[in-house]
Amino acid sequence: MIKISKGLDLPISGSPINTISDEPKVSSVALLSNDFIGMKPTMLVKEGETVKAGQKIFEDKKNNGVYFTSPAGGIVKDINRGDKRRFLSIEIDIKDTEEFINFDMDDSVDQIKDCLIDSGLWNAFRTRPFNRTPGINEIPDAVFINCCDS
């Protein structure tokens, strides 16, 4: 075991370059079922349909009113299903000119909640102990905030 106290000096020569390089653009994105435990989707789009970034793609059958939105604008390429038509993934080919949906939000609690639901950000909330997306009418007893990416 290595113990470090009072920092560590790394022998790196030179200094960082202050430029932003043009990396290749992403051509397609996908929503994977493994990211959403226990979710059963009701599809709101079809293959070949054009979607905007932030547009509702599917709704959770088990949790009515909880929507999942498109991470990018483009054309729905594939809706992949497995055994017994189990949802596996939905693939979207990104267009060069991306369109997106604007979400307006005021200071009221109901409008903030509606914005979170409509934009698909409600899915970032998790219930304990089973790590599921909370229902839209549930009121939590406590909110835990984790500032570490794990």
Show the residue positions of the predicted features.
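Acidic, glycine-anchored pre-beta loop/turn
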Residues: V45-V51, N80-D83
